[in-house]
Amino acid sequence: DARKGFEQELAKEGYKDGKNLKIDYVNAQGDQSNLKTMSQQLQKDKNVLNLAIATPAAQALQKQDSKTPMLFTAVTDPKSAGLVNNVTHPDTNATGVTDKVDTAAQIKLLHKMFPKAKKIGLLYNAAEENSVVQIKTAKKVIKSLGLTPVEKTVATTNDVQQTAAAWAKQSDAMYSPTDNVCAAAMNTIGKVTESAKVPVVTADAT
């Protein structure tokens, strides 16, 4: 858990919430429409430092407040997301760590595990730059293996049940990137694909 890890590291340095540190914690609860309001509230709070977990949260917060120092984590590609112009030497108010995975290797692993699968389903939120970057790579690798990518997009967790059901019927195997909407609805995806007897490989440990 990114938040817990951050707090644990602060504690190691002698900073503890409620003693010599105050932490304002807000959670979108899987609904990205809440991010703008949350970012506005954090800006009003005039914090010394903000931590954004995941690409959509970091983008929303930086758009609202480009001055307060911001750390980000669980961001796949900070440059493509517009958070920094240079990942080696960040030149904005933001810096942090990425959770970028080797998408090509994961697709090749999927193919090795399920060699008879010819149609590979790809489920993601097209509004998440982190997902778009991974899907672009996934499609390229899938095609290079002589397979067919089957794309389906979701905007919120409410879309997942119906979309995943249609997705499962059209796919022999499925791949889900480090996508926040999909991660929040992974139980639903698991139930749908299990029922359809379609294997799933995910980039997110969730």
Provide a role label for each language-model segment.
Residues 1-206:
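Short hydrophobic alpha-helices and adjacent helix-cap/hinge residues
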